[in-house]
């Protein structure tokens, strides 16, 4: 019933412009960028900002790029060695701590056109970049979190591929996060009442590239609302 608030993470990202917050070749942020974007949401919910280094140690352990060191010793040509040693030492691309307990139940359409559900670790060992978080072309996902924010309710995240990269951070605060793929989840609106009740949803976050907002081909999950003109209560944060 309350009006929505539009949050723009750009001002927070600009504070960290010298960190590796954007992929160099893709229109998306890195896990580091997604971390700072998430802080804007958590601050709106009344939480103090998290410490990135403390979170990295929880997710990735204390591993600090030994694979890069090994590669720089193996390739001795000066130019190649310089390129390797200059690579970003972001642990997200190097090692993922298998002790991280977070996992998700992913629902997607298989090759036969049937809906299939599988349980997997939230961050994948065999993928890198945003694919390590997104995985297959899913419809929706239920992420088990740590719930350290002690919220009474949970969170529904309606997100594109960029938005889902915030999931490991949001699941720190909530016990469960229901993630709807804005590109694929055509049944979201018709099942919304059931989802809100079943998963005790307290907050709904819609996270999408502003360039795609309002384009029905990029918003399958919300298209019924667009057609009905049901998104007029959004107010912009000052």
Where are these regions (language model features)?
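Extracellular glycan-modifying ectodomains
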Residues: 1-238
């Amino acid at each position: 019933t309350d009006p929505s608030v539009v949050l723009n993470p750009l001002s927070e990202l600009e504070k960290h412009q010298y960190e590796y917050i954007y992929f160099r070749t893709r229109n998306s942020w890195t896990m580091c960028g997604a971390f700072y974007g998430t802080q804007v949401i958590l601050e709106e919910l009344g939480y103090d900002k998290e410490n990135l280094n403390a979170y990295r140690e929880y997710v990735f352990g204390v591993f600090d790029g030994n694979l890069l060191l090994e590669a720089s010793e193996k390739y001795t040509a000066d130019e190649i060695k310089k390129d390797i040693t200059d690579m970003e030492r972001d642990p997200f691309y190097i090692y993922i701590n298998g002790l991280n307990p977070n996992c998700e139940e992913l629902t997607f359409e298989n090759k036969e056109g049937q809906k299939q559900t599988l349980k997997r670790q939230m961050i994948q060992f065999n993928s890198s970049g945003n694919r390590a978080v997104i995985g297959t072309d899913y419809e929706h996902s239920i992420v088990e979190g740590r719930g350290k924010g002690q919220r009474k309710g949970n969170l529904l995240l309606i997100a594109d591929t960029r938005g889902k990269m915030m999931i490991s951070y949001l699941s720190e605060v909530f016990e469960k996060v229901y993630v709807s793929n804005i590109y694929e989840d055509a049944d979201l609106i018709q099942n919304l009442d059931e989802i809100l009740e079943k998963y005790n949803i307290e907050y709904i976050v819609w996270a999408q590239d502003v360039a795609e907002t309002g384009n029905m081909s990029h918003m399958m999950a919300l298209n019924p609302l667009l057609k009905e003109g049901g998104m007029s209560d959004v107010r912009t944060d000052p």
